[in-house]
Amino acid sequence: MKTQAQLRTELYSALYANTTLPNNIYWIGKPTITSTFPCIIYTFLDDIGGYAFSDGLVSEDVTVQLDVYVDLGDQANMDIIVNELKSVMYTIGYRNIGQPAEFLEADIQKIMRATRWEKWNV
């Protein structure tokens, strides 16, 4: 079983290696008004959907949330990014769970779409 640090490295490397995706890829964060957009934020969730900060061994069922932030009016670019995310995540063995959720982040005036992914860590 991989540690969370190994899973995080594997995910970041796969996302960063895709030349179609933006290079602004961050782990557990929230963009600010001065951040460069579009950007991707990824977080590992624990068994009940909360944030997991541990570097120890994780459960066999790993859940990742990917948040894509784009400027207002840039939904077409968001769709392209999300489709590329699907390709990357399927390639490294994750499957999409649930439907994407889309929000307006009023404090930074950006649109955010969250998707969740699951992988068996065996």
Please give the residue ranges for each predicted region.
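Oligomerization/assembly interface segments of phage tail-like spikes and tubes
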Residues: 58-72, 110-120
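Amphipathic alpha-helical segments
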Residues: 8-19, 80-94
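Small/polar-rich, solvent-exposed N-terminal microdomains that initiate assembly or binding
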Residues: 1-52, 107
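N-terminal short leaders/motifs
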Residues: 12-22, 61-74
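Acidic-leaning, charged glycine-interspersed low-complexity segments
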Residues: 83-122
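Short histidine-centered beta-strand/loop micro-motifs
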Residues: 51-57, 77
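Short, conserved charged micro-motifs
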Residues: 73-81
